[in-house]
């Protein structure tokens, strides 16, 4: 029973480290994308186009 607790604790510890490393890598990727002007333009377009579509559909529907 003691060995199973040790192995579970080891798995938990390794999983926590792995999760931490993945989060750091993801944060670094997000910062890199924010720094790229082309990516920023794409994000603005993604936010802008649905808004324009809703406005136009509202005007056409009335």
Swiss-Prot record:
Residues 23-45 form a propeptide. Keywords: Amidation, Amphibian defense peptide, Antibiotic, Antimicrobial, Cleavage on pair of basic residues, Secreted, Signal. Expressed by the skin glands. GO terms for cellular component: extracellular region. Its main location: secreted. The modification Isoleucine amide is found at residue 60. InterPro entries: Frog_antimicrobial_propeptide. The keyword Secreted applies. Residues 1-22 form the signal peptide. The keyword Secreted applies. It is found in: Secreted. One of its GO terms (biological process) is defense response to bacterium. Antimicrobial activity against the Gram-positive bacterium S.aureus. Belongs to the frog skin active peptide (FSAP) family. Temporin subfamily. This is Temporin-1PLa.
